[in-house]
Amino acid sequence: RFPSDAINQDYEYAPVRGATAFTVTGVAIYGPEDGPGGDAVAHELGLYEEDRQPIDLGICGGHSGPGGQYHYHYDANCMHWHADTSSTNYMFEDVASSVHSPILGFAFDGYAIYGSYGWDTNFEVKEMKSSYQLVDGATGYGGISDYIYVAGLGDLDQCNGHITSTPHSVEPVYHYHSTIHNGVNAHGFPYFPLCYHAIPDSRNIGLMGGTGGGGAAPIGRSTNSGNRRRGF
């Protein structure tokens, strides 16, 4: 269930665990944390050793959780493969970098999630990069709390989105991107949206094992603000 018209507001709460969005093919998109609470992608990249529970992401950036439901933690290009060549190795280096990425799915607030390539304000295609980086000495073992948002580090805001034109709207519109890298070319935490830009449909919260509220306060922003952002 996706709102037909996303309602703009200050950033909204999102589930700590479970589905935060769905792909256009109906597969759940989860936040960056795995069951034990670490960054599943950082573990896959070898940044830390997971000693709490066996975790492994397949070639497409996903795996099965409790109950056997397959879900994605990052965009490994399987859902939108469009290479510059005839290659089918699903390597990011071979993704067509001269065209805007397609829509991968929709967050529960109704906004679209595009792949990693988008338009800047001059309609030039570029890789959209996140604005998060690891806190000094952190590895991702602590999940979301190991990261800090640095405004201007990359192209995207705290929720991993921005306002520009897209192939579906010449008028600039808010949308999310999947991210492979951050602004200094390290791994692209949070990989998919980290919070909601608009009011999500509450009927979606709790699907596929989500726990609803109780998420962390927004990274890099004071919790004393009157309008708080909250991560998955």
Model feature map: region roles:
Residues R1-D51:
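Solvent-exposed N-terminal domain segments of exported/luminal and surface proteins
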Residues R1-R17, Y74-G118, G188, P193-I199:
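A short, polar beta-strand/turn micro-motif
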Residues R17-A19, L57, G67-H71, D75, ...:
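Extracellular structured ligand-interaction cores
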Residues Y48-I59, V150-Q158:
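Short linear interaction motifs
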Residues E50-S87:
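Aromatic- and glycine-enriched beta-alpha-beta binding-site module
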Residues V99, F106-T211, A217:
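Extended, compositionally biased non-globular segments
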Residues M208-F232:
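Disordered, low-complexity segments in secreted/periplasmic proteins that are enriched in proline
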